[in-house]
């Protein structure tokens, strides 16, 4: 299990690429549960028995068919939520950006965002 360092799939060659997304998401979720003390990012309630991981700043749907989609599964973009907080309406992109800024620092999150290989950046942070 990966517990040290930044949880960025680009830093772990064994998880790089689309073919390893499922394994990487499982590792990322396990590590985030420990780091965030099994608490929901939205409510602070326990997610020990009821946890979903939400990509909040940029989603899979926004990058459908893009070869580098796997790069969005980064700790800065993933949020732990109870099922009832995730469905039917997950937290807004704006809330996720603010939460990530609080957890990791605005400069770090911006550096990650602008390092993604967009043809054109969909929005500014």
Report the location of each language-model feature:
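A boundary/linker detector
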Residues: 1-37, 44-50, 95-125
């Amino acid at each position: 299990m990966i517990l040290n360092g930044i949880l960025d799939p680009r830093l772990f060659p064994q998880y790089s690429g689309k073919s390893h997304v499922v394994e990487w998401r499982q590792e990322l979720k396990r590590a985030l549960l420990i780091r965030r003390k099994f608490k929901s990012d939205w409510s602070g309630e326990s997610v020990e028995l009821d946890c979903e991981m939400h990509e909040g700043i940029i989603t899979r749907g926004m990058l459908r068919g893009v070869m580098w989609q796997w790069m969005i599964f980064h700790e800065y973009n993933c949020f732990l939520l109870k099922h009832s907080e995730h469905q039917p309406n997950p937290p807004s992109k704006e809330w996720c950006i603010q939460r990530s800024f609080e957890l990791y620092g605005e400069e770090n999150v911006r550096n990650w965002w602008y390092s993604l290989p967009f043809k054109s950046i969909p929005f500014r942070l």
